[in-house]
Amino acid sequence: MSKTHLTEQKFSDFALHAKVIEALENKGFHYCTPIQALALPLTLAGRDVAGQAQTGTGKTMAFLTSAFHYLLSNPAMADRKVNQPRALIMAPTRELAVQIHADAEPLAQTTGLKLGLAYGGDGYDKQLKVLESGVDILIGTTGRLIDYAKQNHINLGAIQVVVLDEADRMYDLGFIKDIRWLFRRMPPTPQRLNMLFSATLSYRVRELAFEQMNNAEYVEVEPEQKTGHRIKEELFYPSNEEKMRLLQTLIEEEWPDRAIIFANTKHRCEDIWGHLAADGHRVGLLTGDVAQKKRLRILEDFTRGDLDILVATDVAARGLHIPAVTHVFNYDLPDDCEDYVHRIGRTGRAGASGHSISLACEEYALNLTAIETYIGHSVPQSKYNPDALLSELPPPKRLTRARSGNGPRRTGAPRNRRRPG
């Protein structure tokens, strides 16, 4: 983490369990981020917390540190059974659940607490095998958790810690009934440590906190501006006919180390992927139609640097921490103002700088006024020369098979591309 992203508060200054401190120091975590510095004194005192912070500022480690400390410092129920986890962490998407599990593994290795993972799409029997051996901390999506609970593969009667991550997204995706179903099968609220984290603490999220938490303390870390001051924002007004050529020209000119391109529909994403893959870019596609195993592999390839560009719908816009994203392209301006903030928040994280480029085409330009009102400033406009756009581009590839991942590898230097004139 960048030092500009940290506070002067050390983890070692808190009365954290020694094994938790050891795990944090092994990972190089010595100083707290602002949300960690605010949340930990409360959770260590046994207080419930509803936290708001800009994405990428350490929310996950705040609740993981709290959960591991609590379980190590408080004994399990005397009659706890093997199918009863002690902590439950709920996430809105499979990708976020997998990421939280990965972040928790170093803590689990040091402390000896066992992790379980439960998400839909695939891996039912593999996940179940882990659960049947007994887990302390279960991380998952609500649908698969309910499935296991209804079949008595898990029992929530011994839960001591509950975490609800990206609570606003849970509402957006219609999971609130599932959340309440799971809460009703846990011990009473005062008998648990309850944590809720969200990019926004809207009225409905606060209502959920009031309903399911024990006099939760609200902690908020407000950014200087909603879009983050380290993100350079830029806006172009292309015609529909020039939009794809402008995107490809900007990619050639910027030559980003790692970029995410967002579009509003899966069909638009597939079209963008096809053009970039045909043009020789190392590009992956992430939409709801991509099989779960392939989604995880694409994310791993992108994080590892085997892919330079990821084309995605908003399924990837919330919660995922992919380090070192240098550029975000809004091929379509989103219909939801918050999605603009979450999209461009994939770059400029943890003290790094980033570049966001948005294309306000004829179809989605009307969304700009609401977006600028929401973020509190105008997005700087840039102009382009239509005659300087790339030409003679190859026809796009089509998804004629069940593949949706990697295009051909591109070489390390920009190719010469003919331009008119």
Curated annotation (Swiss-Prot):
Enzyme class label: hydrolase
Q: Give the matching Pfam families.
A: DEAD, Helicase_C
Q: What is its EC number?
A: 3.6.4.13
What is the catalytic activity of this protein? ATP + H2O = ADP + phosphate + H(+)
> What does the record give as the organism's lineage?
Bacteria, Pseudomonadati, Pseudomonadota, Gammaproteobacteria, Enterobacterales
Where is this chain primarily localised? cytoplasm
Keyword annotations for this protein, in alphabetical order, are: ATP-binding, Cytoplasm, Helicase, Hydrolase, Nucleotide-binding, RNA-binding
Per UniProt, residues of the Helicase ATP-binding domain are: 40-219
Q: What is this protein called?
A: ATP-dependent RNA helicase RhlB
